[in-house]
C-alpha cells in the first residue's frame, strides 16, 4: 500500500498540482499586499482619506467599551461584533486580480498548446498536375492520372 501511495504521489500530475498550489498561495499573498498596500491607499486618498479596511458596521457593541469605534481595530479590541464590508471589498478586488491573472495564464497556455498541435496530413499533391488530393487516392480526380 505504501508503494502504491508513493507511485501515486510521484506521478507528474500530482507533483505539478502541488507546485501549482504552493505558487498560487504565494501569488495570492502578493496580490493581497498589492491591493492592501499599493492600490487601496491611493484610492482611499482620492476619496478623502478613506481606509476601506475600516469600513464596518457594528452589529453588537463590545463589553469593554461602547460605540462609536473609529477603527475596526478599536471595535475588535472592545469585543464588538462587526460586519466588515471594507475588508470584503478588498477581498473582491484581490480575487478579481487573481482571476484575471489566471485567465491570462490559461489563455497563453491554450495558445501555446494550440500552436503545438500538428494536424495530421490528409492530403498530398498529384505529381502530374500538382493539385491537392486525398492521401489515400489512387487516381487524381483533376487530371485522372494513376498514382
Swiss-Prot record:
InterPro entries noted in UniProt: Mechanosensitive_channel_CS, MS_channel, MSC/AndL, MscL_channel
Annotated TM spans: 14-34, 85-105
Pfam families xref list: MscL
Alphabetized UniProt keyword annotations: Cell inner membrane, Cell membrane, Ion channel, Ion transport, Membrane, Transmembrane, Transmembrane helix, Transport
GO molecular function, one term: mechanosensitive monoatomic ion channel activity
Family classification: Belongs to the MscL family.
Role this protein plays: Channel that opens in response to stretch forces in the membrane lipid bilayer. May participate in the regulation of osmotic pressure changes within the cell.
Full protein name: Large-conductance mechanosensitive channel
Gene: mscL
Amino acid at each position: 500500500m505504501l508503494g502504491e501511495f508513493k507511485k501515486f504521489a510521484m506521478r507528474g500530475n500530482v507533483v505539478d498540482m502541488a507546485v501549482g498550489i504552493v505558487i498560487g498561495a504565494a501569488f495570492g499573498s502578493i496580490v493581497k499586499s498589492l491591493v492592501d498596500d499599493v492600490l487601496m491607499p491611493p484610492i482611499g486618498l482620492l476619496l478623502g482619506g478613506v481606509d476601506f479596511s475600516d469600513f464596518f458596521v457594528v452589529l453588537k457593541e463590545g463589553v469593554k467599551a461602547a460605540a462609536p469605534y473609529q477603527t475596526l481595530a478599536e471595535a475588535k479590541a472592545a469585543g464588538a461584533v462587526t460586519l466588515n464590508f471594507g475588508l470584503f471589498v478588498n477581498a473582491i478586488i484581490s480575487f478579481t486580480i487573481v482571476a484575471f491573472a489566471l485567465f491570462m495564464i490559461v489563455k497563453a497556455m491554450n495558445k501555446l498548446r494550440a500552436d503545438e498541435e500538428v494536424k495530421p496530413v490528409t492530403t498530398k499533391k498529384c505529381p502530374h498536375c500538382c493539385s491537392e488530393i486525398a492521401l489515400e487516392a489512387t487516381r487524381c480526380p483533376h487530371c485522372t492520372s494513376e498514382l
